[in-house]
């Protein structure tokens, strides 16, 4: 924190008992799920992040070392935070974080996270240099996020909801066989599976996208691939879950 922060002895607020201060903080922090696109779209408007319609007070996090230490867990533990992982950026708290840029340390304080990503092709499917650069940027964002959430000594993550976008025609064009599908899933998800462990609650959901009326053959092909994908994701979930003592 900046050296200009007021000294704790000059703040009468800190003379209140800790439980009173915590009660006050509850009226000044978000309690609605934090979604990135609404924050990005409505920058010119007042964003309401509380059920009661009142404003939050992020200035609390800059007020004082002690207040920061008390508020930070409440601020990032009171609601669910969405993280969007794209080929060009990560979105977190309405901020666009491009590849090869460190993530904000506050992401480790998030207790409930909704992670949104879409299945991408692997580099061997790509012939365009610019598309390859985007894919490598996606891989950097993925591994950086996984690393940030891997340290059980610092992270506070207790619930992880993974929403996985699947472009069905693209998926079938990239994976003709079960082994190709598993290669594709590993490329997109292995950093999370290997590094983010011992989370109390892990869930996943497929967000399927298709276009037009599909033939029965198309539907059968996808049904077979979907069963493999669901088995992979269930195994991944079990790997990431917290293991009971003993």
Regions found by a protein language model. Name each.
Residues 206-246:
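A cross-taxonomic marker for long C-terminal extensions/tails that follow the last structured domain
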Residues 16, 41, 93, 117-119, ...:
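Generic detector of low-complexity/intrinsically disordered segments
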Residues 50-223:
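C-terminal-biased hydrophobic
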Residues 19, 31, 152, 184, ...:
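Low-complexity, intrinsically disordered/propeptide-like segments
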Residues 4-47, 51, 58-66:
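N-terminal Skp1-binding subsegment of the F-box domain
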